[in-house]
Every structure is written in C-alpha cells, then in structure tokens.
Amino acid sequence: MSSVPYNSQLPISNHLEYDEDEKKSRGSKLGLKYKMIYWRKTLCSSLARWRKLILLISLALFLFIWISDSTISRNPSTTSFQGQNSNDNKLSNTGSSINSKRYVPPYSKRSRWSFWNQDPRIVIILAANEGGGVLRWKNEQEWAIEGISIENKKAYAKRHGYALTIKDLTTSKRYSHEYREGWQKVDILRQTFREFPNAEWFWWLDLDTMIMEPSKSLEEHIFDRLETLADRELKSFNPLNLRDDIPYVDYSEEMEFLITQDCGGFNLGSFLIKNSEWSKLLLDMWWDPVLYEQKHMVWEHREQDALEALYENEPWIRSRIGFLPLRTINAFPPGACSEYSGDSRYFYSEKDHDFVVNMAGCNFGRDCWGEMQYYTTLMEKLNRKWYTRFFFP
C-alpha cells in the first residue's frame, strides 16, 4: 500500500495553464496579424482615395528639385544677362550661333555673393571685365564667356557657403604707369583683405577658368589633405630652374600661400592665400614700386616674375609657400603648353575628375569661346542628376 496520507494534496499538472497561455498567445498573434491587414487596407484605400493629390505633390517636389539643380548646372545665364538691342542675342563661331544676350556686369565696389553667410571663412575673388572696354571693344563672345564664368563661381560659392567678390579690372588712372595695369591683381588682393577682415582664406580665380567638380569643397579637396598634397621645395618640379636651396628657410612653418607651376613658371590664374600678417607683408613687398620701376622692361609677366624673384631671394617668403600639383586647381586644356603635349602633369583629365580647368592664353591662337563651350557642356554632363536624363538624354 502507498504510504502517502489520504488527505495530502496531489501534484497538479500545468498542462492546463500552458494550454491557456498558448491560446492567449495565439490570439494575440492573430490579433496583431489582423491589425496589420486592417492598417494595410486602410492605407491602400487612403492612397487610392488621395492618389491624384499625392501624385501632384510628388510631381511638384520632383520639378522643384530638378529646377533647383538646373539653375546651378544647366543655366549659366540667369539674371546677369539683359538685352541691350535686338542684334545682341546671337553669337556666331564657324557657322554656328547661340542664343545669348549681352552681359551687363553687376559690378560694384562691394559685389559679393554671401547671402546667409555674412562672415565667410573662404572668399573667392573673381577677376572680371579685363580691360573694361577701354583698351578695345569687347565682342559678344567675350561678354558671354564672362557671364558663364561668373555664374559658375556664383553657383559654387552658394553651394558651399563661401563668399564671392567680383572685381572689375577696368583700366583706371590708379594704374597710369604703362606697365602698372598688369599689377592690378596684387592691389585687388590688398583691397579684398580689407573688405573681408575676418575671412581665413582667399581663392583668386581668373575669368577664363571653369570649376568642373562643383560638389567638391575646398576643405575636402585641399585643406584636409594639404600636408600630403603640397610640395614645399622645388626639387621635384622646377621649370624655371630657380635656386632650389637658399639659407635660413624653415619649411616647418605653416603654408599660407598655395600656388601651382606650369611650363612657364608660377601660375597665378588660380591660387590661394591666407589672411595673415605674413600675407599682408608679402603683398606690400610685392606691390613695392621699386620692383616694377627697376624691372618692368625685363619682366615679361610682371607680377608673376616679381613673385618668382621674391621667392628665389627671400627665405621668409619661401618658408610659407606651398606648391600644389597643377591639375589640383589649374588644369590646362590641350592647346596650352603645347610643347609639353604628352605630359599628363599639365592637362585636364575627365577620367580623373580634375577640379578646375584654366583656359589661360586661349586668346593667343586658340578659340576661347569654343573651349568655354566645350568645358561648360562637359561640366554639366559630369554633374547632372540621374533624373535629368529623362529630359536631356
């Protein structure tokens, strides 16, 4: 017989509790499933009921984004172009014509593109209206080139929050000396330093340049990798055979003037200079009348030759100059430096997505308008959005 007392509690099986829990769990899962089906049907019915409005809003949003992008990349002539007369809207070149109106330069002593950023870190200086129509009349193609170049820099400055100041190079009595006019670049730099006292860097660009990769910021493209990008000495590339070693040079000092070299020496079509006391002293030395008075009959390239002389002889200047590879901010079209046509260091590469192309010297035996058209079209092609292909295949 069992020794278990008759009045003791028998062990109770938990199967009933498990079954109840399983039913509840199954019910909750089914409830969640039914809720998901319900909300899906509700959403689908709402979308079906409002499909026209949703489609209209989506289309409007798409058009807004597309037009905003087109304003920067596909339309280089916006409000800067105004009609002058009925015969001013056609340019012809080798039998072809374009619809372009005479460009009216929006110059002022303080013409700048900064809008929301009143205290920009980087200021782009664009030299425009060279000669100012004083030395000779400017033709329609020159006005169009000027307008395209200005809009290219405006779009880039707006995109990255930089300031753009457009400097009118009209010949004036300030440069009454027959050779002094070519030194405007130095004087304009000094003026711009005073105009933007809180800026950190200034980027000078000649008019015949085109920013080919507007998505790249200067921080990303240059400043974040400056130590590995720039060359402090002339040992690797010295086209003018300047002295590559002079005493008292300290290459550990910070770089405050970033330039490039081409087949003719220092290239000042695109360069960067820092806002510092060193830079102000350099500009004062560079602007010294003794330089042009003593050497203006010898120096063919004027301010460029003066800078080369200062670099070669002044260790305090050499200590803070860095040389960027030419194609970093100054790539050339095939017609420039023709004697080095096979040297890839000089010429723009579409494959490598070079940042800036400089059509320097295009007015000496080359086609400035043809080159500007080509690189503008190429820039648009390389940077257009995927959806523009539906409209511009």
UniProtKB/Swiss-Prot annotation:
Residues on Lumenal side: 74-393
Catalytic activity, EC: 2.4.1.-
Region (Disordered): 77-97
Domain of life: Eukaryota
GO molecular function: alpha-1,6-mannosyltransferase activity
GO CC terms, sorted: endoplasmic reticulum; endoplasmic reticulum membrane; Golgi membrane; mannan polymerase complex
Cytoplasmic topological domain residue ranges: 1-52
Listed GO biological process terms: cell budding; cell wall mannoprotein biosynthetic process; division septum assembly; protein N-linked glycosylation
Keywords of the record: Endoplasmic reticulum, Glycosyltransferase, Golgi apparatus, Membrane, Signal-anchor, Transferase, Transmembrane, Transmembrane helix
Membrane-spanning segments: 53-73
Membrane topology, from the record: Single-pass type II membrane protein
Protein family per UniProt: Belongs to the glycosyltransferase 34 family.
Subunit structure: Component of the M-Pol II complex composed of ANP1, MNN9, MNN10, MNN11 and HOC1.
Note: Present with 6280 molecules/cell in log phase SD medium.
Cited function: Required for polarized growth and efficient budding.
Identification of the protein by name: Probable alpha-1,6-mannosyltransferase MNN10
Species whose genome carries this gene: Saccharomyces cerevisiae (strain ATCC 204508 / S288c) (Baker's yeast)
